Each structure stands twice: as C-alpha cells, then as structure tokens.
C-alpha cells in the first residue's frame, strides 16, 4: 500500500513500513504549491546576475567562481557525475527505498527550489521499483552524503547503474524498462539532490528499527533465561523501578513481569530458595535493558526530526530569500548512531552473560553442563556460547564512537565533518551480530526451561518456545549446529519471536 507523506510530520511508523516492507511513498499533493514557489524563485535567480551558491557558482572551495547562465544544466550534470565516487558493495534495496523516501520528504518542504518533475520522478522510481545502485562507502556526513546521493541522482539523469526487477542495468535502461524518462537538471537541482543527510539518516533508521526489534526479543529471551535459571522475579517489582523513575526501566520491568506471569517454574521456588540474590545479568535486566530502551527512544526522536528536516543548502526561506547555512551537517545523526551502537552493544553484552550462566553448572542452579543431556559424550551448547562471546566482543569493538573522529576535507572548506554515514552503516553489522546473540540465548534458555520439566514456564514464554521449536528441535544429542543458530537468529531478525507473544507486552519506541 502506498504511503502518503506529509513533510514535516512523517511518523517513524511510516518509515518503518518503507524499511521492513518496501512500501512505495508519494508526497501529499497539498505540498506541490510550495515546491513550485521555491522552484520559481531559483529560476529567477538563475536568469539574473546575482551570484548565489550552487545556482550560478561553483561548489565547495570553488564557490567563488561565477557560472554563466548558459552553463546551468552543464554545471548540475558535472556536479552529479564528478561526485559519483562511492566504493564498496551496493546498499540493500530497503535502505535505498528509505533514502529516496527521505529525499522526497526534504524536497517536499518547499525550501530546495526543485521542480515538481524531480519529485514525480522519485515517486515513480519507488512505485516502479527502479533502485539506484548506491555504493555503501564514500560519505563523511558533511556537506551532506554527497557521494551516495550522487549515485542516486545520476540514475535520475539516465547515468550510473540501477536495479530493476532483480537485474543490474545502466541507469537509462532501467528507467526505460520502467517506462520513465531521465531528467535534465535545472538550476540548483543537482545540489538539492545530493546536499542532504538522507543516506546517513536512512542507515541510522535501519539500525534503530533493527535494534528495537532485537531489544524486544531480548526481553523474551531474558525472561526465558530467568525461568531456566530459576531466577527470582522479585527484582522486577514495579515499586522498585518507580522509585528510580527512568521510563525505560519501568517499562522493561513491566514487560518482564508480564512475560513471566503464570510460570509454574517461578512459583515452585518462591519459598525455601536458599539463594538470596541472582547475578546481575538476571536481576538487573530492567536497569540495563531499560537504559538501552531509553537510548533507543531518544535516538528515535532525533531521527524522526531529521527524517522530516530540510538538509539542503542554500535554502529558499519563507520570505523568498536564498540563504546559505549548514543543515547538511549530520552531527545529530552521527550522535544518534553512536548512541544506538552503545545500546546494541549492551543488550548483547548482558544477554551473553545470561547464556554463559545457563551453560555453567556452577551457576545455573542444577542444569547440566552446557545444557547437554549426556555431558562429556556430548558438548551441547558449549561452542554456541563461545560464538556469542565472539559476537559480543566484535560489537564492543564497533561501538567506538564515529562522531568524534572528524577530519578536514575539500581543501579545508569542509573542515569539520560528522562521519555519520559509516557510523550508521556499522549498525547493520552490529544488529546482525545481536540477532545471532539473542538467537543463541533463545536456544540456551529454551533448553534450560525444558530441563525443568515437569515444571512449566509461563503461557507467554511457552508461545515463544513453540515458535522456536517449530524450526529448531530440542537438542537431544550433538548435531551439526550451524543451521540451529541461523534459524534462531532469523526468528529474531524477521520479527517472528517478537510476534509470538501477546501484543502490548513489549515496549515500543514511543513514550520517552
């Protein structure tokens, strides 16, 4: 179903649909008049003699060079072609769809000075499935995501390469097969297309959506691990968390209580348990995962604002003046990406400690070593835990902030940059690692719960276990394990594990 975008107020939920489901997007037609007004203003400047950056001047360090009106189209074409300097593998289709949609939103605010023809072409590319081949590397996140967005714009001109119906084609051929016509860029249009944070923001949004899904799944596996270890639910008591006051912590504790409600395992050790306190990885889940939830919610707000922002330069303001600024600088996105990386790292770190607890017979309160039915003859989940440790450590390495590593570019004209693009891109690998860690915890926790038979877990966790066991059977004896890990990770990544429990139990991104 096509999503109608209202620039300035597009909610994260719509952007998530574009990312997860590839839904096309169009601008609400009420924004057409504002787009046309700004385009007319730029056309008037281009026809005159007043120098305005990007309209009739060179770019970056070459901004002082005046360009003749007769060379306007050549200027914009040269800009795009010269900036197609991306390297590396192509970004995934759902990321590129998000980039195109974010560019629609920015242009739709009516401050960029592009013609409606450009807007309609982007809409048609989304509808028909013409997906520009955008290399993953080459942006420093200021002045905008120049190289990635140049590859997008080049396809609109009939240059570069694009995917259409699964085939990689020259840009012009891809457009032709979709029944579309390349555009000849008018004054400032090339600059408007590439001067923006849409690539960084799309990658950061992808990281956010994936991190939130993993965070929700981690509450399910964390609750399951709590039951498998016969851990206490007392630390999840509401009053404890209300006394501290952090919203994420309060919501996380509520989710854990709901997930464990009705567990016979939990009831069995309410009285007479000689253990006074559980290890932190069980007891402090609300404090750790709740803090991560708060971080994700903060970044969600930042990225929702950025998704609706005009990050072009110069801008056509409400009084028709055209003013140069710096909205292309992606520092807010870079900070958000760094915060998401920290949350992803910590969700995985505490989950890995729960995995380690369950496979250690000195900590697991009666479970066999490595959750093997015949330890010694079988190694059980020994190396699955080692894999989770490797993934956790890799994420720790990647969690180093990207935003603090500025370097001057473009002959020192662009002397401070955000590094938002690769800071956001690493979130794809980090969340892939996190999906696998949470998948491994699902395997260890479910195996541990089954060892507690005839005692049973809660109805909600039982539904999650049934979802897991539909694709990964109980480990009766050693077998080729890689498919088990892949299947469990896929349940986290595709949302099946989250979808297995009742709606409303797991916390959303709203509420901060």
Curated annotation (Swiss-Prot):
The modification 2,3-didehydroalanine (Ser) is found at residue 143. It catalyses: L-histidine = trans-urocanate + NH4(+). One of its GO terms (molecular function) is histidine ammonia-lyase activity. There is a cross-link at residues 142-144 (5-imidazolinone (Ala-Gly)). Contains an active site 4-methylidene-imidazol-5-one (MIO), which is formed autocatalytically by cyclization and dehydration of residues Ala-Ser-Gly. CDD domains: PAL-HAL (cd00332). Keywords: Cytoplasm, Histidine metabolism, Lyase. Belongs to the PAL/histidase family. NCBIfam families: hutH, PRK09367.1. This is Histidine ammonia-lyase. It comes from Allorhizobium ampelinum (strain ATCC BAA-846 / DSM 112012 / S4) (Agrobacterium vitis (strain S4)). The gene is hutH.
């Amino acid at each position: 179903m096509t999503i109608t975008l209202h620039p300035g107020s597009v909610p994260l939920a719509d952007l998530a649909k574009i990312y997860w489901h590839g839904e096309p997007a169009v601008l609400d037609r009420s924004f057409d008049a504002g787009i046309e007004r700004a385009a007319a203003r730029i056309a008037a400047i281009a026809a005159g003699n007043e120098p305005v950056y990007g309209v009739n001047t060179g770019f970056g360090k070459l901004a002082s060079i005046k360009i003749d009106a007769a060379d306007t189209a050549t200027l914009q074409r040269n800009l795009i072609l010269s900036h197609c300097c991306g390297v590396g593998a192509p970004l995934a289709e759902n990321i590129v769809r998000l980039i195109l949609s974010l560019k629609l939103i920015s242009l739709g605010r009516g401050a960029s000075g592009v013609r409606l023809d450009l807007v309609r072409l982007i809409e048609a590319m989304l509808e028909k499935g013409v997906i520009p081949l955008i290399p993953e590397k080459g942006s420093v996140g200021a002045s905008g995501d120049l190289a990635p967005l140049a590859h997008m714009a080049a396809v609109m001109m009939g240059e570069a390469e694009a995917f259409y119906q699964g085939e990689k084609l020259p840009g012009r051929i891809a457009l032709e097969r979709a029944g579309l016509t390349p555009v000849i860029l008018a004054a400032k249009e090339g600059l408007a297309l590439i001067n923006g944070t849409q690539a960084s923001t799309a990658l950061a949004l992808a990281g956010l959506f994936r991190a939130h899904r993993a965070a929700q799944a981690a509450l399910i596996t964390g609750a399951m691990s709590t039951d498998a270890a016969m851990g206490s639910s007392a630390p999840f008591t509401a009053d404890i968390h209300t006394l501290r006051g952090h919203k994420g912590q309060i919501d996380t504790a509520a989710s854990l209580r709901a997930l464990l409600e009705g567990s016979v395992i939990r009831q069995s050790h309410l009285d007479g348990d000689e253990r006074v306190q559980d290890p932190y990885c069980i007891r402090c889940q609300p404090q750790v995962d709740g803090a991560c939830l708060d971080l994700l919610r903060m970044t969600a707000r930042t990225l929702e604002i950025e998704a609706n922002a005009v990050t072009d330069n110069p801008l056509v303001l409400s009084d028709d003046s055209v003013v140069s600024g710096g909205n292309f600088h992606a520092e807010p996105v870079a900070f958000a990406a760094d915060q998401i990386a920290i949350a992803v790292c910590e969700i995985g770190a505490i989950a890995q400690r729960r995995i380690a607890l369950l496979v250690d017979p000195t900590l697991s309160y009666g479970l066999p070593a490595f959750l093997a039915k015949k330890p010694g003859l079988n190694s059980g989940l020994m190396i699955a835990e080692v894999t989770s440790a490797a993934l956790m450590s890799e994420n720790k390495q990647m969690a180093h902030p990207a935003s603090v590593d500025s370097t001057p570019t473009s002959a020192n004209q662009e002397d401070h940059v955000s590094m938002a693009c690769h800071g956001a891109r690493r979130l794809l690998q980090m969340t892939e690692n996190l999906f696998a860690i949470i998948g491994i915890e699902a395997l260890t926790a479910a195996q541990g719960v089954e060892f507690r038979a005839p005692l049973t877990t809660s109805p909600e966790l039982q539904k999650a276990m049934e979802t897991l066991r539909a694709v990964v059977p109980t480990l009766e004896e050693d077998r080729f394990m890689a498919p088990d890990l892949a299947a469990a990770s896929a349940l986290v990544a595709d949302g099946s594990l989250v979808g297995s429990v009742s709606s409303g139990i797991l916390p959303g991104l709203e509420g901060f």
